[in-house]
């Protein structure tokens, strides 16, 4: 699967789940479960409830995603 196939959306962290998983509400109102990307994990980027994030979704499963950026 190529990187161009991913859908990027903005969202807000609703709650923190175990194993660095998060419940994220997207701009369109959908709620997805997302995990942190490897680069964010490697650089110890902290994500807290209420943070604005960018989430990548695949067209195959729109209920799960990957957090790739935390807005300031």
UniProtKB/Swiss-Prot annotation:
Cell division as a keyword? no
Q: Which GO terms describe its molecular function?
A: ribosome binding; rRNA binding; translation initiation factor activity
- What is a single Pfam family found in this protein's UniProt entry? eIF-1a
Q: Looking at the record's lineage, which domain of life comes first?
A: Bacteria
Q: Which InterPro entries match?
A: NA-bd_OB-fold (IPR012340), RNA-binding_domain_S1_IF1 (IPR006196), S1_domain (IPR003029), TIF_IF1 (IPR004368)
Q: Which SUPFAM superfamilies match?
A: Nucleic acid-binding proteins (SSF50249)
Asked if the Swiss-Prot or TrEMBL record annotates the protein with the keyword Protein biosynthesis, the reply is yes
Can you list the GO cellular component terms from the UniProt entry? cytosol
Question: Where found in the cell?
Answer: Cytoplasm
Report domain S1-like positions: 1-72
What family is it from? Belongs to the IF-1 family.
The record's PANTHER family line, in alphabetical order, gives: TRANSLATION INITIATION FACTOR IF-1, CHLOROPLASTIC (PTHR33370:SF1)
Q: What is this protein called?
A: Translation initiation factor IF-1
């Amino acid at each position: 699967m190529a990187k161009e196939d991913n859908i990027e959306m903005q969202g807000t962290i609703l709650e923190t789940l175990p194993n660095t998983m998060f419940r994220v509400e997207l701009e369109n109102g959908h709620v997805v479960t997302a995990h942190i990307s490897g680069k964010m994990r490697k650089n110890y980027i902290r994500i807290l409830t209420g943070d604005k994030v960018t989430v990548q979704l695949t067209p195959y499963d729109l209920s799960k995603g990957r957090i790739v950026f935390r807005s300031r």
